[in-house]
Amino acid sequence: MAAAAPRRPTQQGTVTFEDVAVNFSQEEWCLLSEAQRCLYRDVMLENLALISSLGCWCGSKDEEAPCKQRISVQRESQSRTPRAGVSPKKAHPCEMCGLILEDVFHFADHQETHHKQKLNRSGACGKNLDDTAYLHQHQKQHIGEKFYRKSVREASFVKKRKLRVSQEPFVFREFGKDVLPSSGLCQEAAAVEKTDSETMHGPPFQEGKTNYSCGKRTKAFSTKHSVIPHQKLFTRDGCYVCSDCGKSFSRYVSFSNHQRDHTAKGPYDCGECGKSYSRKSSLIQHQRVHTGKTAYPCEECGKSFSQKGSLISHQRVHTGERPYECREYGKSFGQKGNLIQHQQGHTGERAYHCGECGKSFRQKFCFINHQRVHTGERPYKCGECGKSFGQKGNLVQHQRGHTGERPYECKECGKSFRYRSHLTEHQRLHTGERPYNCRECGKLFNRKYHLLVHERVHTGERPYACEVCGKLFGNKNCVTIHQRIHTGERPYECNECGKSFLSSSALHVHKRVHSGQKPYKCSECGKSFAECSSLIKHRRIHTGERPYECTKCGKTFQRSSTLLHHQSSHRRKAL
């Protein structure tokens, strides 16, 4: 086989590494034996060491200074035989530290330690690290990069079948671009996962083998048909989403490990429920469900969690942080899963159809949860009272009734709620928003439930009856509070004055007497009130609304109490 002839020096007295490099074609490389390939590497190393010791530049003429450059070549721990015409025994002083070495190869190895100190220095904080892999991990702390390729191994990747010098090879660039600079080594090969045999014995760079690259640059494929299904694993924010449970992952390896928990019976079995896992760490996290062990407590409310990620998501309830933003509509979310659900609503595609009722769903785990409505399955059980639920979220909300946790606090008045939806509805009291409209009379409400209760006024429906006196009510909660009149029960007591009340809402309003708080402000005149009902009555002064009409004479009034007083005058006249 004929190897390509080395190029001649372009200038008198100037020798570059490419001038003495020997390049093989793809076909020629395949014909080399293992011993010949090892010899090829040794020769290239000797040439590099010789040129470095002479202070020559190892790059092309257009490239920049050699002090920050190095070549990445995989070497085995074997003896290197000096070539003819090369005298390794010579005094070689190191310009960096002053150390003098006689052997040219030892001198080359010594100089490489200085290069590594520069190459493995963090550009953000100047910290030196021992290894390039540690630099990769350290750099992620500065740039927050979650998606990164596999660390470049100590192997020889050569672009376009040439030994190339890499300049600053371990400086991270903007996400989505090459990890290595344009004049460096393995710009395209860095994204390809190579086996040990390919790295040791394969050609320096196999062109045409991985022409199709995933947009995230985490995986490369040999055919276009292979990359398309891989790309479907991503959402718009670049995460891997599990189609079985909706959980999202920033790294493909974490996503792949998680999927094994759904698809395969792992070697780690739970002794309590028999569930199996492919990883021991997953089993340990699962066992905390049975033991109740929670290793991560919230400093704000004291609630504990079995996983650190769950604690981080929970803390956003207190801080109000919503880091996940939809790029199309600008809507923000506190949890990544909520953003994913929202984004899937853009296309409107509902791939999962219920055979029982015909309802469709965008996500598989939502479809699975829905099917439990028909099957009656309730796999999530409360450890306090034994009540079971079909969805985990319903169990979490139910457990707040036992713990008394109210994580959602109104910044206007300080009132806390168990559910975010209740906080949203409450905040409409301060903003004046009333999105629910009665079709009969046009009256507006800030809660859908209040609209449903109000509509019973028009229909005359009163489905809830008092067991003692038979009085009918349109609201179940009103029946519960009313029955306390018969029993004399007043379970809500004020800590300040000891006064007790029938309902928690009445106690909450009463506490404002002691605090002096008046959260309900009139937008017309600025007057404030302690109760929402007082503000509603006051607004009628500005609007002129008189909703209470006398059936006898047709006279209208702003307040029901005034109407009752007026009706008594008709009764007196009748007597």
Swiss-Prot record:
BP-aspect Gene Ontology terms: regulation of transcription by RNA polymerase II
Answer yes or no on keyword Nucleus: yes
Q: Where is this region: Disordered?
A: 69-88
Q: Which PROSITE patterns match?
A: KRAB (PS50805), ZINC_FINGER_C2H2_1 (PS00028), ZINC_FINGER_C2H2_2 (PS50157)
Q: Where in the cell is it found?
A: Nucleus
Sequence ranges of Polar residues compositional bias:
71-81
The intrachain disulfides are: none
Keywords assigned by UniProt? DNA-binding, Metal-binding, Nucleus, Repeat, Transcription, Transcription regulation, Zinc, Zinc-finger
The task this protein performs is described as:
May be involved in transcriptional regulation.
Q: Which family does it belong to?
A: Belongs to the krueppel C2H2-type zinc-finger protein family.
Protein name, entry field: Zinc finger protein 417
Q: What is the lineage of its organism?
A: Eukaryota, Metazoa, Chordata, Craniata, Vertebrata
Gene encoding the protein: ZNF417
